[in-house]
Amino acid sequence: MSMPAPKLSKKMMRRAFLVGGLQLGFAGVLAVRMRHLQIDQADQFRLMADENRINVRLISPKRGEIYDRNGITLARNEQSFRITLVEEEADDVKGVLDKLGELITITPEDVEQTFIELKKNAPFLPVTVADRVSWDDVSIVALNAPVLPGITPETGLSRQYPLGSYFTHVVGYVGPVSTRDLEKRDAPDPLLKIPRFQIGKSRLEASFEDHLRGKAGARNIEVNAAGRVMQELDRRESEAGANLKLTIDANLQCYAQARLGEESASAVVMDCKTGELLALTSSPSYDPNKFVRGISHKDYNALLEDKRKPLVSKSVQGAYPHGSTFKMITALAALEAGIIDEKTTVYCPGHLEIAGKKKYCWKRGGHGKVSLEKSLRESCDVFYYDIALKVGIEKIAEVARRFGFGEKHDISMSVENEGLVPSKEWKRRMRDSDWLIGDTANVAIGQGDVLASPLQLAIMTARLATGKMISPKLIADTNAQKNDAEEAGVTLNPAHLKAVRKAMYEVSNARNGTAYRSRVIDEAFRMAGKTGTSQVFTISEAERKKGVTSNEDRDWERRDHALFVCFAPYDDPKIAVSVVVEHGGGGSTTAAPIARDILLQALYNGTPPLTAYPVKDRATISKQQTQFKEILPRLKSGENVET
């Protein structure tokens, strides 16, 4: 039965009104919501939109450069290109890296390192995928930006050491920030969290890290949906690090390093009047640029396994028995104590009986009647055994400390070895045993427990030469370190110092002096010096049975160290030099010629004339000078050296 038309019409109208009301209500709610979104929360969504399209990138500062005393560049920055990845901008990191690998050359190691860095860092921080890429690679990446989301080519600065291995043990090198580097700092600089950001890892690069690094800048950049940089919205420039100027003379440093050759050795050159270090060498060395670029496991293991220890800065880290170079200290202690004077003599039959045992002189037949001058000139051991037992270890140790032994010297090299000046208290504390008179006899001739670095030997020599408390300085006039010379005296009787200096002159200039064969002929530059041989191992009975009777018969590691210290000119000391050749044998045959050559190079400020050398040496020296002229870099003041 059908419903009458009027009733049907009314029912439809009610439904229409209901639907219309619902639609109007929904539209009203929507309008209110739209108003809330568009007006009330407009600023918030505008900020969110900006955050989605604006990235903040830190601007690395230019690292301060390092120069020698004449303005020759030792560490500088070179422009380089790298490819970075921001994880949150890449939809599929593996896919993006695979695509990148199709376009440019990236190694499996690069990819592996990238994933390691991504795990360690926030997703919004850029991670370096490939460093030191070519300009062609940069262009290819830029052109393919739409298919490489999160990938950005960047320009940066890389550290370069123009003089390579010549300055490794002074300047050091930089390398990527490690977890350990961050842990050592309470509030790390944000720069240090940039993946593969490089900081000083050794020597001056590390000691002056805060001085050299500078301060970060920042830039706000706008990117499109594909991650391509559209424009730079804002920029705050970085502040470059401060430069560092050294007292080292690059020409002399290169010569000294070359003169050491393949020896495991060190040489230190000091200005006697100011304490400025003119050369600070250690051999063998290595190329620091390899560490900046990423040294291979093979190359690094080769350095670790080299028995000559190229990673050790021997000039400051080495600690060696002084050998006979310590005899000047023993002599001064006896003079100051009034035990001897210049005319005192001791008879040397070739040995001295101490506590029921014979202590031998190096000259088994003996030196006969020995004065102070003769004792140093011919390096008689018995003379020093005798006077040391009378003066005692405490007085000897006191004088040794006045000449810079047993302490570190502030030259901003954190690896410096303080050496050792033993005493009765030291032996009780360290070995829980009493001091014996045999210990005193050993120390008197620079054997036993007394140890020094080549730097300390140079300091002693400069103080002996001048009578002043000269302290070493490696940093020239900068805000980083004050460079005033020490003028205080060593508080010893000037007559005693004069007597020791005169004996050192005889060592190098008297026919029976131990360094006579390495003398300087030029009257204006006559040197005073002292040879030393420090025993590493005594020849055992087992070795003697095998026919080992001399140093040369032994394995290299068991041979004695060779030492020589000197200063010149004798009448007006300007330069002090110390040389230590590990396992080099006698100081007179190995260390003295090297020290003499370096000393003359410093005094002449370049290649000395052949007439400065003994006639017997001139042919060898001429050949050596020609060879060095070919291999040494030619350096001029203010020059940027190309490798």
Predicted regions located by residue number:
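Periplasmic/cell-envelope proteins involved in peptidoglycan metabolism and beta-lactam response
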Residues: M1-H297, K307, A319, D341, ...
